[in-house]
């Protein structure tokens, strides 16, 4: 239901689906955690993202999304990092951060609404508390990066302004 909802949301909001290649000739954003393989005498890599293709498609179509597999050869000591996963990557030409957050809220709300409407039985089988999901409504609370740094530092974490939050 989640995958169906993602596709339905983007299709009903005039996003164009463009699948990106799974084999690519280079890394995305300068990273080096790639799965490489011989590809007719050259090295090809399993794609980490369809972002490069998505950005070009967004400039052509205005709104675009890619939904496909991603591969990352990251060595991790946690179970939170997968080497293979599926990722949805929407791109909107000339979209600012506030519009981006609005689209994210709309997407998450749409998915939750459909899952709660069509998959309540499955949520109960998985022993999920649907009351928490029902409370997840828009607008979502928002804070600035600076406010977040202050909250983290006030709660005993040490993080400098400009640092990544990490995972």
Q: Where does each model-flagged region fall?
A:
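Metal-assisted phosphate- and nucleotidyl-transfer catalytic regions
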Residues: 20, 27-34, 106-167
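Short acidic, gly/pro-rich beta-turn/loop elements at beta-sheet edges
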Residues: 56, 77, 98-100, 153
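Class II aminoacyl-tRNA synthetase-like tRNA-binding/catalytic domains
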Residues: 1-93
């Amino acid at each position: 239901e989640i995958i169906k909802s993602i596709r339905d949301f983007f299709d009903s909001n005039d996003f164009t689906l463009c699948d990106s290649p799974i084999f690519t000739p280079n890394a995305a954003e300068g990273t080096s955690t790639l799965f490489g393989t011989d590809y007719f005498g050259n090295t090809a890599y399993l794609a980490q993202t369809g972002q490069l293709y998505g950005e070009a498609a967004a400039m052509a179509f205005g709104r675009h999304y890619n939904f496909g597999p991603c591969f990352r050869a990251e060595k991790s000591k946690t179970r939170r990092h997968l080497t293979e996963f599926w990722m949805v990557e929407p791109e909107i030409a000339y979209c600012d951060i506030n519009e981006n957050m609005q689209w994210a809220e709309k997407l998450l709300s749409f998915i939750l609404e459909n899952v709660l409407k069509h998959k309540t039985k499955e949520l109960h089988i998985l022993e999920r508390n649907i009351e928490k999901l029902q409370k997840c409504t828009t607008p979502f609370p928002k804070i600035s990066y600076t406010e977040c740094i202050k909250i983290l530092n006030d709660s005993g974490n040490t993080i400098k302004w400009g640092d990544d939050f990490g995972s």
